[in-house]
Amino acid sequence: MGKIVINCLSLVLLISANFAAAQSIDTGRGELSLTVPAGYEASTPAPLVLLLHGYGRNAGAEQDAYMKFSALATNYGYLFAAPNGQRETQGNQAWFWNASDACCNFQGSQISDVDYLMTIISKIKSQYNVDGNRVYLIGHSNGGFMAYRTAFENSQEIAAVASLTGAGATVAGPAPLNPVHILHIHGTDDNAFAYEGGDLRGNSYPSAVETVERWAGYNGCDIDGSEVAQLDLDRNLPGLDSIVVRYDNSCKAGGSAELWTITDGAHIPALSDSFSTTVVEWLMAHPKIASTSTD
């Protein structure tokens, strides 16, 4: 019996050692769940990934259930959180981010979500050993708008942004102080935020191409992109449904831009089994500066 108990205990320890653990931090808007990768050691800097949800009834946890980035935390060794934005007090009572003129602060909130996200990053850094060259933002729809704004205003902190359907600001501003790697993913049949750009409640938003070329310019890259690959990003579309266009010539160190166009892709694509892994691997390959830095 003693041997059986010991073997069972060993099995439990082995299983737990291979799965990420859920911790929590106080963000000022309540407790935020933080996924800590199995094997995390305070002596080794870990990347940090924040996932920003879209506008609607679903918030951070539901966004992660759709995109499944927390499930990859242990394999790639990153800390992960999917915070909630603000919630409307009237009408749909939807969750939203105060991101841009176009999307999606429809009730005129004066609360800064940029400050909130930077507070989250700061608090995680105060409790965990975060690699300062590998702080990443992923956003979907309104969350993509929010990721772009946060990176623009805090380019010294954010290494890269991956946005699914969320566009840049309505009006282009001067370049941020530091380069930021940009990955924009957009379906050509998006009926919420058109691939070609458009207007939402009287406020325009740029097209997918304009968003990427704007950031390519910010990063000092040539704005003539090159088609370099095809990907399978939507399981409901046949074959290699997405075209990769890369802007990485003459870029400043720590900056680049890339557009993944999902041909016939919708606003909420049926993500392929490889989607999240492909995005994470792209992020991890794009640190703010050389990964050997001790900053």
Model-derived segments and spans:
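Serine-hydrolase catalytic machinery in alpha/beta-hydrolase-like enzymes
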Residues: 25-136, 146-149, 153, 273
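Primarily recognizes the serine-hydrolase "nucleophile elbow" in alpha/beta-hydrolase
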Residues: 125-129, 133-180, 191
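C-terminal catalytic histidine-bearing segment of alpha/beta-hydrolase fold enzymes
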Residues: 181-185, 206, 218-295
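Conserved alpha/beta-hydrolase "acid-adjacent" motif
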Residues: 191-196, 204-207, 270-272
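Acidic beta-to-alpha connecting loop that harbors the catalytic carboxylate
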Residues: 85, 188-191, 196-199, 263-266
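The conserved beta1-alpha1 loop
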Residues: 50-54, 186-187, 263
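Boundary at the C-terminal end of the N-terminal hydrophobic targeting segment
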Residues: 20-22
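N-terminal signal peptide c-region/cleavage motif recognized by signal peptidases
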Residues: 15-17
